Amino acid sequence: MHDRRWILDNLDEATRRLKKRDQSHSFEPLVALDKELKAAISTSEAASATLNFVSQSFQPSATPEYRVEAVSRAVQFAASFMPAAPAPTAFDKGAYQAWNRTLKEFSGALVDRRKVVEQEIESYLMRIPNLPQASVPDGEGEADNIEVRRWGTPVEHAFAALEHDALGEKRNILDFEAAARLSGHGFALYRGLGARLERALQAFFLDSHSDKHGYEEVLTPFIVRRECMVGTNQLPKFEEDAYRILPDDLFLIPTAEVSITNIFREQMLEASDLPKKLCGFSPCFRREAGSAGREGRGLTRVHQFQKVELVHLTAPEDSARIHDELVSHAEAMLQALGLAYRVMELCGGDLGFGASKCYDLEVWLPVQKRWREISSCSNFLDFQARRADIRYRPEPGAKPRFVHTLNGSGLAIGRTVMAILEVYQTADERIVVPEVLRRYMGVDVI
């Protein structure tokens, strides 16, 4: 959600930043709606004042001079706003009581219209993406993203390596055929040491973030109310991509970002409560998964996958620093696993709907010979906090402010499995277990 007043008061800057995403974006509809709202408010206030003044003229205590003034005000108001129902030009109690009833109906219609326009403004703002920060690079899409840094040496196998899905099926740790029989295309079934590898990554990520990085671990429900999805900007724009449960109007979460952030929905925090750092594991459910060719194979894009999510709530002045901290925590997982990666700063045209600034971590996949996103770390500023009404008091008695929210994957487990299978496979089609996972796995090789 946006600060409507800030946008209208800083229209040039807001438009310039919005156009970082798409040159076709414009705030002209908002300007028109705001103009209509102001007119409705002004007319409604004038109608109420006229109604009150004329009503007082019916009192026995009203002087002739007061009634003359009431007639004058009524005639002027009707001429400006109710030309089809002109006010009597001379005071007659019966005639003015009849005209007052018409004025009440007109005033009520104005109130109704004001509510409609306010709803239209809210609906419009709900569908406008967050404004990119001024430092976000210009660009139209993925090709315009900027590489910030790399870590590790990308592996190049000297043998005919297998892609992760073929290797997983050969080692009997992934079974896509059984998953399809159960749920259809776009699902994965883990077997034996494959299931243990998933569980080991979950435990390693959570242990690292809670023990080393200071996050509070939470385990939230995986089903949430509609207002939670609105709060973290999945709705209304992406409703068709969500799994909805009828007749309760509940949703399977597409990421633990939704449930963790909304722990604080409609809450008033104190400055001493900030920053909040939470991590949590969850399955993630997304209807939009699946595509032709390699993109639709194996674990690349599925309807259900597991992930450990990192969420921060912070004071506005700290969010830029904490964004860098968040990225470093996700990087630490890849470094511990020995997986080469690069950090990409997303351009305006590639930003997610709610992000004001985002860094993607892309892991190297030697068999596919490409970099693949494994974590997105975003700063939302107060965009989500306004939608979810999450505020804090900078000091006792001070005016409340909206917090800033940030989140990132730490990491997506399915894609981490995919990377491990591609990077750590051997010429005899086995998989070396990364050293940090061996105490969880109980084996060195799969």
Predicted regions, residues:
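TRNA-recognition modules of translation machinery and tRNA-sensing kinases, especially anticodon-binding
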Residues: 39, 148-446
